[in-house]
């Protein structure tokens, strides 16, 4: 009797998993559908470009320099680096490269804790229209902010950019990460976007408008996967995460 019950449970789980994979596969096919580009718009959006950084002295300046080379009016964006729990010269390197610094006041256990303070004390208090989030080891394409401006001006309140790899051939690990990024872009975010469904915020290179952040009561993630949690919060409040493949960042 026990073996029969276990067999039925395994069978049921296998059927459910198979149905999920069938659904995922059907949706993924739409990743090959040609999509219309977001209309180009004159620069209007004032961005806060935010990066939480812990012991990132070796790479943080590269991020800041790539942001300073944006094809976007410099008066319409600020670069804010929030060093936290550092034992190296991250703050000094970021400031020397041209970033503004924000020193978190509370106890920091995760990236979400940093974003909570930055959103409350900088993004919303500073009158920015939107926040772009980056990781300290990212490089940002020169047209990133211009293309995010297009998406925001088109009415999107949460936007995930195209997360690419800057070192796919360096090692087996970096190669696997690169394949993961490419598959996520093509078979998940691009496919779901083609169907009018919500994309997935994945780590960095994403934008959230100040209006959305106010509606959510600030940044309120509590898990270590703050990107997925934020995506869920958007879905629960009826907001779709858009995908903007023309806004490109390069991750390490």
Model-derived regions: residue spans:
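Short beta-strand-to-loop acidic/aromatic patch adjacent to the donor-nucleotide binding site
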Residues: 125-139
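Cell-envelope/extracellular polymer assembly enzymes that use nucleotide-activated donors
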Residues: 45-48, 78, 229
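N-terminal membrane-anchoring/stem segments of glycan-assembly enzymes
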Residues: 1-43, 96
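Catalytic donor-sugar/metal-binding loop of nucleotide-sugar-dependent glycosyltransferases
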Residues: 222, 231-249
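A conserved acidic beta->alpha catalytic loop
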Residues: 83-91, 106-108, 139
């Amino acid at each position: 009797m026990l073996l029969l019950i276990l067999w039925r449970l395994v069978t049921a789980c296998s059927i459910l998993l198979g149905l999920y994979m069938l659904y995922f596969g059907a949706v993924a096919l739409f990743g090959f559908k040609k999509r219309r580009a977001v209309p180009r718009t004159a620069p209007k959006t004032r961005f806060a470009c935010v990066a939480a950084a812990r012991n990132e002295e070796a790479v943080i300046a590269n991020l800041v320099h790539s942001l300073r080379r944006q094809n976007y009016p410099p008066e319409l964006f600020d670069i804010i680096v929030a060093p936290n729990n550092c034992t190296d010269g991250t703050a000094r390197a970021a400031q020397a490269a041209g970033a503004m610094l924000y020193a978190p006041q509370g106890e920091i256990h995760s990236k979400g804790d940093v974003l909570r303070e930055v959103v409350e004390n900088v993004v919303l208090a500073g009158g920015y229209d939107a926040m772009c989030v980056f990781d300290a080891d990212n490089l940002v394409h020169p047209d990133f902010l211009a293309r995010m401006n297009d998406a925001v001006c088109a009415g999107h309140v949460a936007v995930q950019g195209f997360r690419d790899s800057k070192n796919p051939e360096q090692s087996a690990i970096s190669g696997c990460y690169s394949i993961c990024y490419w598959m996520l872009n093509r078979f998940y975010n691009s496919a779901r976007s083609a169907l009018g469904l919500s994309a997935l915020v994945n780590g960095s290179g994403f934008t959230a408008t100040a209006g959305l952040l106010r509606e959510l009561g600030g940044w309120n993630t509590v898990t270590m996967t703050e990107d997925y949690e934020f995506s869920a919060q958007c879905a629960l409040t009826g907001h779709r995460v858009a995908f903007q493949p023309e806004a490109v960042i390069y991750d390490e």
